[in-house]
């Protein structure tokens, strides 16, 4: 900073400190007036633009905030704090590319800036760049060991790659540093749920709600692990929250789904469907794509495959052989993965969207040019990229399961790139499957068709059509297993399943409920219990309310 700027700051120090005090006290307009007057007197002082930027950021005038933080960095090119504030503002605006660049500039000018490392790690976490996320979050903690938010974010990064013990340790550290950290309590509950401990999960969801009674996500999570009884205090709390006008749409979705679960437990069908329909209605409004887009995409995929362009020969051997478990959500895929991954030679990776993320850009590129023939080297690249993506699981087993169920869309690409892979397809009664889908909230944006009876039925039929297509194109390559048969003839179906997967018999596969691996899906509790029958008939008691869905499925 130039000497005259330093002198100006010294002269204006009293007024600057007063403006900062007002800002910290929440008196934003008063602080703005003082800073604007100071900028008119001293237009080349970067600190003033940074302070005014924080004022604008606080009152959500993000465009003005970006202008001021940018001006501060122009006047002082090594101004790490202004770059970091600029990153926060871009992040709040949804411009993550610009946010990443701003945080990197902050770190380039001050590598010992824990906030910048934490914020950058959080973006990498959201984008699925887990290794980079962990690197920056650990750096933030090294620089500031009592950084509760960084410990919480690191826990979430570990959770993404199924390192549950590390995740739990990080969340506990965050809570120890900040006992009233509601988000960390909720996240610790999620981690315990994935280990198969609903009792501990419930405790931390309840802690989160005690700290923040309006925490909609925690209410929804708690609803999934408890059985409600009459006069439950949580019911009254959620009902009162829904009356408030300042709730976000996302919060209303979580609370309606939570109430629906509660009224399902209580046997109040009318209230169950009142809240279930409302939650689904709001959730559908959030979705940008229509069911027609999903149907068209399924038809588009078929164009890439015919008897002339399927190549199934590779000379290289894979370090670990994949088993892809596919089907509709809520069809029993989590149960089957739990069974297979109980085998001593199998690592259960859970829902891995790696193949989807690799193949979709390739599909889009070819579709734009109406070129539906993939070259051998493209399949070889897909094979290499997906194989490399599995390395982050550090699995020592010979076989790995991938339960990204919507991989049913890309079976042709999977078998072309991995002819040695196994495809296990779950089949379940359509009515049971669709009812179970409709009553569950999916955080994944890919299930845009799940929140409306007609959309759900249309997608189900499109799914059946695509599976028929793959069966005809790859006869004998896809193993169908019926959920109903599996639950009624457990040992017979398990033996047949393992035989198809080229796995020797392992008694542990019958005792799948003792498997302690992480389970990320809504079935995390169910797969810890012994197999039970009858779940495919539960929809019948709601047939009066489900008539539009049942008619659409015919």
Q: What name fits each language-model region?
A:
Residues 223, 235-246, 255-322, 369-398, ...:
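PAPS-dependent sulfotransferases, especially Golgi type II membrane carbohydrate sulfotransferases
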Residues 1-14, 238, 246-248:
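TPR-adjacent "capping" and linker segments in tetratricopeptide-repeat scaffold/adaptor proteins
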Residues 16, 20, 24, 47-58, ...:
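Conserved alpha-helical positions within TPR/SEL1-like repeat arrays
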Residues 24-33, 58-71, 91-105, 115, ...:
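Structural signature of tandem alpha-helical TPR/SEL1-like repeats
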Residues 316-416, 426:
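Phosphate-binding active sites in nucleotide-utilizing proteins
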Residues 414-437:
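Conserved phosphate-donor/acceptor-positioning beta-strand/loop module used by diverse small-molecule
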């Amino acid at each position: 900073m130039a000497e005259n700027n330093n002198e100006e700051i010294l002269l204006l120090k009293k007024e600057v400190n007063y403006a900062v005090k007002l800002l910290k006290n929440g008196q934003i307009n008063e602080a703005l007036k003082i800073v604007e007057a100071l900028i008119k007197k001293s237009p080349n002082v970067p600190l003033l633009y940074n302070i005014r930027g924080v004022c604008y950021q606080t009152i959500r005038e993000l465009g003005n905030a970006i202008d001021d933080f940018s001006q501060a960095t122009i006047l002082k090119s090594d101004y790490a704090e202004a770059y970091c504030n600029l990153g926060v503002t871009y992040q709040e605006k949804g411009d993550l590319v610009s946010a990443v660049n701003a945080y990197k500039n902050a770190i380039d000018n001050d590598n010992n800036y824990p906030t910048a490392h934490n914020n950058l790690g959080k973006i990498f976490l959201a984008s699925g760049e887990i290794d980079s996320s962990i690197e920056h979050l650990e750096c933030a903690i090294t620089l500031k060991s009592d950084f509760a938010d960084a410990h919480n974010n690191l826990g979430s990064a570990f959770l993404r790659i199924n390192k549950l013990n590390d995740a739990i340790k990080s969340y506990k550290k965050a809570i120890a540093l900040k006992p009233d950290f509601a988000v960390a309590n909720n996240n610790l509950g999620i981690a315990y749920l994935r280990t198969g401990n609903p009792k501990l999960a419930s405790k931390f969801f309840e802690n989160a709600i005690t700290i923040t009674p309006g925490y909609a996500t925690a209410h929804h999570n708690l609803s999934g692990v408890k059985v409600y009884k009459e006069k439950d205090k949580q019911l009254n709390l959620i009902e009162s929250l829904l009356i408030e006008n300042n709730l976000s749409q996302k919060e209303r979705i979580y609370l309606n789904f939570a109430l629906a679960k509660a009224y399902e437990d209580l046997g109040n069908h009318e209230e169950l469907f009142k809240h279930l329909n409302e939650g689904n209605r709001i959730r559908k409004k959030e979705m940008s794509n229509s069911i027609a887009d999903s149907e068209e995409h399924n038809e588009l995929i078929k164009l890439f495959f015919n008897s002339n362009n399927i190549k199934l020969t590779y000379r290289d051997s894979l370090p670990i052989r994949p088993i892809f478990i596919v089907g509709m959500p809520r069809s029993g895929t989590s149960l089957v993965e739990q069974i297979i991954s109980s085998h001593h030679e199998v690592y259960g990776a859970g829902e891995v969207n790696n193949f989807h993320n690799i193949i979709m850009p390739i599909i889009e590129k070819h579709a734009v040019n109406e070129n539906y023939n993939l070259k051998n080297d493209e399949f070889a690249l897909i094979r290499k990229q997906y194989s490399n993506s599995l390395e982050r699981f550090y699995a020592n087993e010979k076989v790995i399961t991938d339960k990204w169920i919507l991989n049913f869309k890309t079976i042709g690409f999977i078998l072309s790139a991995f002819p040695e892979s196994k495809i296990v397809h779950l089949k379940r009664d359509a009515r049971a499957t669709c009812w179970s889908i409709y009553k569950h909230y999916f955080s994944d944006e890919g299930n845009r068709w799940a929140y409306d009876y007609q959309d759900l039925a249309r997608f189900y039929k499109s799914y059946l059509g695509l599976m028929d297509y793959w069966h005809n194109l790859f006869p004998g390559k896809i193993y169908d297993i019926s959920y109903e048969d599996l639950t009624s003839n457990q040992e017979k179906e398990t033996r047949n399943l393992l035989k198809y997967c080229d796995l020797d018999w392992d008694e542990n596969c019958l005792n799948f409920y003792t498997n302690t691996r992480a389970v990320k899906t809504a079935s995390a509790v169910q797969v810890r219990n012994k197999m039970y029958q009858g779940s495919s008939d539960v929809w019948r008691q709601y047939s009066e309310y489900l008539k539009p869905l049942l008619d659409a499925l015919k």
